[in-house]
Every structure is written in C-alpha cells, then in structure tokens.
Amino acid sequence: RVEDLYQEWYATVVKTTGTGNQRNVESRWRTRILPAIGRKRITSLTEQDLQDVVNDAYSDGLAKKSLQSLCADMRAFCKWCRAKKLTTFHPEGLHVPAGARPKGKKVLQPDALITLFRVDTSLYRGKRVHDDFIHAYRFQVLTGLRPGELVGLRWADVKGGTVFISRAVNVLGEQTRGKNDNAVRAFVLSDLA
C-alpha cells in the first residue's frame, strides 16, 4: 500500500534533506496525499489518482507553488518506487491546473517606506513601543537581504565596504547556505546603508 511505502520513502527524505523540507513534505503527505491515495496499492495507482489530489488542493485555494510542491512530492515518490522495482508507473502528465495563481506579494508602499525611516516604534499589543530591530528592518530594505540572510549576518562578513553573504538562518534556527545557489553573493554597501 502507498501509506506503507510512503514511510520508507520518507525515511530517505529525512536522510537527504534539511529539517524545513522534511516538515513541509510530511505536512503535504499527511494532509493531502495520504488521505486520498494512502490505502491504494502502488500497482493500482493511476495518474488520475494523483491529478485528483492536485485538483482538490487547487479547488481548496492552494497557491501555485504549493500545487507544484505536491506534484514534485508525488513524482519523487513514484521515481523512488520505480528505482525499487515496485512499479513502472511514470506520472508524466501530472500538472498544476492552468488557473492556479501565485500567492501575491505585498510590496512596501512609498508612504510605509517613509514611516520606516522616520519612526522607530512599533505597535505591540495595541501600544506604541520602541522597536529594537528597527535598524535591521531599514538595513534589509536598503540592501534587499532576505530575512534569514539578515539573521545569519556576522560582523566578519563585512570587509571594507563590501558585505559577503554566505549563510542564512531558517525558522527553526538552523544555519543553511541560503535559499538557492544565488544566495551566496557579495555586494558593496551604499552610503545610506
């Protein structure tokens, strides 16, 4: 059954990926994939079974990236099953519905930008308090650093007027190499930064 094979496959995910990815994979399988196909035999699994998982998630309003991740999980699982000679099933037609939309990003507006540089307080439980991280927020806006890169920044990363980005800290407090290969980079500080 798929649910039994999933346990084996997930053990390989744990060995080969970071904690953040493991949590995301486990969550998608627990909430979306296993309830739909967990009781099926791997030999009776069809591409439509997998597409139904994606379509149901789409109708529930999941963002395009989440749907892509669902597809990637199920493709990786099928590839692992093929490697173990459990099936020859290859879901090549599995796709994200055309109407799927990316999650919108909230862009900092000019009036909010002015406020960021004029005010050093934040609302905390309905009260205005001094924000200890105000300079970090300003630095992030001026440099374009991702939040995890900002947390991972060390004084040793600044040499002269150049900042070398080589690490990030994820939501679990783990040090990583960054979001992708482009995350390792260097830039010259502006006068304002």
Residue locations for each model-derived region?
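N-terminal core-binding DNA-recognition domain of tyrosine site-specific recombinases/integrases
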Residues: 2-88, 102-105, 123-131
